[in-house]
């Protein structure tokens, strides 16, 4: 699973997801891409599950690029803990995704295979997506 090797701060604010993606919203590396249509947090587990689903479909021929990275820690408190005594410990990592962000790119396979692979990956993610062709 993806996570940063080291960070400047251990805990982040939750923040808000306003507006559209101004960067990372075009197909750069591959011929086909999966683009987000909604704003959401995508966990490192979801990123990995989608990658595995795509890899299984594409086999050896294709090349896959993951265009997002989970760099935001999400903290959680232990179950049945009283209020107070500070913020919880970091539990998992998320990537903040805004509408328009390209999530995955694919190259080296026929369009039919690419569409099936990207649709499988999309089913593992918590956002509505569309498939782009370069």
From Swiss-Prot:
InterPro entries: Ribosomal_uL16, Ribosomal_uL16_bact-type, Ribosomal_uL16_CS, Ribosomal_uL16_dom, Ribosomal_uL16_sf. GO terms for cellular component: chloroplast; mitochondrial large ribosomal subunit. It is found in: Plastid, Chloroplast. GO terms for molecular function: rRNA binding; structural constituent of ribosome. HAMAP family: Ribosomal_uL16. Residues 1-21 are annotated as: Disordered. This is Large ribosomal subunit protein uL16c. Pfam families: Ribosomal_L16 (PF00252). Belongs to the universal ribosomal protein uL16 family. Part of the 50S ribosomal subunit. NCBIfam families: rplP_bact. It comes from the Eukaryota. GO terms for biological process: mitochondrial translation. Keywords: Chloroplast, Plastid, Ribonucleoprotein, Ribosomal protein.
